[in-house]
UniProtKB/Swiss-Prot annotation:
[4Fe-4S] cluster 1 binds at residues 9, 12, 15, 19. Pfam families: Fer4_7. The keyword Transit peptide does not apply. Ferredoxins are iron-sulfur proteins that transfer electrons in a wide variety of metabolic reactions. Keywords: 4Fe-4S, Electron transport, Iron, Iron-sulfur, Metal-binding, Repeat, Transport. It comes from the Bacteria. Residues 2-29 form the 4Fe-4S ferredoxin-type domain. Binds 2 [4Fe-4S] clusters. One of its GO terms (molecular function) is 4 iron, 4 sulfur cluster binding. This is Ferredoxin-1. [4Fe-4S] cluster 2 binds at residues 38, 41, 50, 54.
Length: 63
């Protein structure tokens, strides 16, 4: 599963809408990834979609 580095997150929302597993949601003013839903997009995409769309490098990272 992946996680979001909250100190780097700009709360733009790009990742929430791109996640094919609906694993990303807003909690207490920032986005979080539900590890029970995150599949790292294996079998769906070459790399996790949250990583692909996040405008800030190294914000969506392996947990």
């Amino acid at each position: 599963a992946y996680k979001i580095v909250t100190s780097q997150c700009t709360v733009c929302g790009a990742c929430e809408f791109e996640c094919p597993n609906a694993a990303i949601s807003m909690k207490r003013g920032t986005y979080v990834i539900d590890a029970t839903k995150c599949t790292e997009c294996e079998g769906q995409f070459d790399k996790p979609q949250c990583v692909s769309v996040c405008p800030v490098d190294n914000t969506c990272v392996p947990a």
